[in-house]
Every structure is written in C-alpha cells, then in structure tokens.
Amino acid sequence: MAKVGKRLKAAHEGIDREAFYDLPQAVHLIRERATAKFDESIEVAMNLGVDPRHADQMVRGVVELPHGTGKTMRVAVFAKGAKAEEAKAAGADLVGADELAADIQNGTIDFDRCIATPDMMGVVGRLGKVLGPRGLMPNPKLGTVTMDVATAVKAAKAGQVQFRVEKSGIVHAGVGRASFTEEKLVDNVRAFVDAINKAKPTGAKGTYLKKVSLSSTMGPGLKVNLGTISGAA
C-alpha cells in the first residue's frame, strides 16, 4: 500500500487540479503520469448541457477513432446461414442464434459488442434484461442491427466507440492507451469530441459542451481548455 500511495502522490505532483490545460499539454501530463505496471487506459469525460430524461436531449452514437482504442474487442453476432459465415470470416468471436441466446441467458457474456441481423431480433429481444443494462443490446441507430455484419464486425474490431450520455449529463469513453503516442491520443480525443458535437440533440438549450476532462486509469484528472480542441463549442 505504501508503494501505491507514493506512486499516486508522485502522479499528482506538479498538477493544478483547478487549471485548464491545452489539449496537447494535458495529454503529455496524463501520459507522463501513467506509471502503473499495466498499460493504462486514457479516458475522456465530457459534461454536457442536456437532460437525458427528455427524449429530445439524448446524446447517443458511435465514432471510429482514427487510431483505435488499444482494446481487444470480442464481438458476438446473431446470424444464420450465409450471414453467419460472413460474420465468422470478418473475425467475429461468437456467432450463433438460439444456442448463443441460451448461453447468454445462462450468464455467459464473454463479449464487448453484440451485433444482429434484423431477422434475429425476435431472439435477441428476449435478452433485453440481460444485454440492456450492460449496454450490449443491438440497436439499428448504432449500426449493430444490420445485414452488413462484416462491416459492423470489422468496425468494432478496429476500435469503434459507442457513446451514450448518463443521467448526470456526462458522457465518457476510453480513447486509447498510455502506450499510444501523444499525437495519436490528441487525434483520438479530437475525433471523439467532434462526434459528440455532431450528436448535439435538437432539444439542447444553452451551452452544450460544458467541460472536458482527461485522465488515465490510475492517474489524476485534468480539465482541458475547450478552445484547444478542434470542433469544440
């Protein structure tokens, strides 16, 4: 515990928690302080001026980060026949129909993304109480209910990120790893923020993008100067 406390103290040294840092500087400081024995995830959190309890203020979508997330994604696909073979060829980890649904009902959820062809939604729909709370329910708006399963699988494997605003008005996501170069992390953060801006709902009033913070898994959080993020408004 002493070593952990010493490392955390060192990570916070030289950090002004109240200051707003330019994006490149924030990335540099966060990455510099990601000293855990594993490859820490770099996370972005955004405070939005929305109330997601209202349907016209929901923020939800997907974004393909230019350099991926650094996370190995396991993908499950509900499909039959030729579409099942297409999913397997694209690199899906789990492909099936009723038998896959049975495994999930029994508590076996060994995947990070779930995709389904439209004809399989009758089967998948029965899994709503299991997949829904985990954010795994296939959704046509997110491109995970589709006949083009190959493209969906490849996008998930390449680091496509799904986002959804929480009740508190915060949306967050992993945008890379500490092992990424600073340039790649900056690119990914800007791509994510740009996607959130493009997903601005019609019912949003006042300031939409209120605050952006950056952190690593075990490190301090830093507030980012919005003016240094391309597309931030």
From Swiss-Prot:
<comment type="subunit">
    <text>Part of the 50S ribosomal subunit.</text>
</comment>
<dbReference type="GO" id="GO:0019843">
    <property type="term" value="F:rRNA binding"/>
</dbReference>
<keyword id="KW-0678">Repressor</keyword>
<keyword id="KW-0687">Ribonucleoprotein</keyword>
<comment type="similarity">
    <text>Belongs to the universal ribosomal protein uL1 family.</text>
</comment>
<comment type="function">
    <text>Binds directly to 23S rRNA. The L1 stalk is quite mobile in the ribosome, and is involved in E site tRNA release.</text>
</comment>
<keyword id="KW-0810">Translation regulation</keyword>
<dbReference type="GO" id="GO:0006412">
    <property type="term" value="P:translation"/>
</dbReference>
<dbReference type="InterPro" id="IPR002143">
    <property type="entry name" value="Ribosomal_uL1"/>
</dbReference>
<keyword id="KW-0694">RNA-binding</keyword>
<keyword id="KW-0699">rRNA-binding</keyword>
<dbReference type="InterPro" id="IPR023673">
    <property type="entry name" value="Ribosomal_uL1_CS"/>
</dbReference>
<dbReference type="GO" id="GO:0000049">
    <property type="term" value="F:tRNA binding"/>
</dbReference>
<keyword id="KW-0820">tRNA-binding</keyword>
<dbReference type="GO" id="GO:0006417">
    <property type="term" value="P:regulation of translation"/>
</dbReference>
<keyword id="KW-0689">Ribosomal protein</keyword>
<dbReference type="Pfam" id="PF00687">
    <property type="entry name" value="Ribosomal_L1"/>
</dbReference>
<dbReference type="InterPro" id="IPR023674">
    <property type="entry name" value="Ribosomal_uL1-like"/>
</dbReference>
<protein>
    <recommendedName>
        <fullName>Large ribosomal subunit protein uL1</fullName>
    </recommendedName>
</protein>
<dbReference type="InterPro" id="IPR016095">
    <property type="entry name" value="Ribosomal_uL1_3-a/b-sand"/>
</dbReference>
<dbReference type="GO" id="GO:0003735">
    <property type="term" value="F:structural constituent of ribosome"/>
</dbReference>
<dbReference type="InterPro" id="IPR028364">
    <property type="entry name" value="Ribosomal_uL1/biogenesis"/>
</dbReference>
<dbReference type="GO" id="GO:0022625">
    <property type="term" value="C:cytosolic large ribosomal subunit"/>
</dbReference>
<comment type="function">
    <text>Protein L1 is also a translational repressor protein, it controls the translation of the L11 operon by binding to its mRNA.</text>
</comment>
<dbReference type="InterPro" id="IPR005878">
    <property type="entry name" value="Ribosom_uL1_bac-type"/>
</dbReference>
